[in-house]
């Protein structure tokens, strides 16, 4: 599954105009296992998957601890093992200008960072700016860079 995800991320980045994508990969265990101190999943599962895609020409690096990998902003994408590992930093950067894109499926789809906001539905409190931003982003990704 990690290999498929990294290939999908690489293809999606190329589709939006990044010719040579650089992809960071988070670990499964805390701090990417600290060389086996906190588990062996990153040694046994994540590192071999990264090596497989690197052998196919994909510039993937890791595994990195999910709590610190975002500090290195030289990557074009950050792939994570768990949903919240990716959403937390994105929401901290800009809650109303953040969207989740799902790649590797037959249909490209996205959701706004705040979710459905059912708690404020029909109360006149909703701010459509996140939805508008998300629609602009996904329409650009669907069309591609050209």
Where are these regions (language model features)?
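Glycine-rich phosphate/nucleotide-binding loop
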Residues: 49-146
């Amino acid at each position: 599954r990690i290999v498929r995800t990294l290939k999908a991320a690489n293809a999606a980045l190329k589709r939006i105009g990044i010719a040579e994508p650089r992809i960071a990969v988070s670990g499964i265990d805390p701090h990417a296992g600290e060389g086996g101190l906190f588990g062996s999943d990153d040694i046994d599962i994540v590192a071999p998957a990264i090596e497989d895609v690197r052998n196919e020409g994909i510039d993937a690096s890791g595994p990195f601890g999910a709590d610190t990998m975002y500090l290195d902003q030289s990557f074009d994408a950050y792939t994570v093992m768990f949903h919240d590992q990716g959403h937390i930093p994105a929401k901290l950067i800009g809650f109303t200008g953040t969207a989740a894109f799902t790649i590797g499926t037959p249909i490209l789809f996205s959701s706004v960072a705040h979710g459905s906001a059912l708690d404020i539905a029909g109360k006149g409190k909703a701010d459509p700016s996140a939805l508008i931003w998300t629609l602009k982003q996904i329409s650009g990704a669907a069309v591609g860079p050209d």
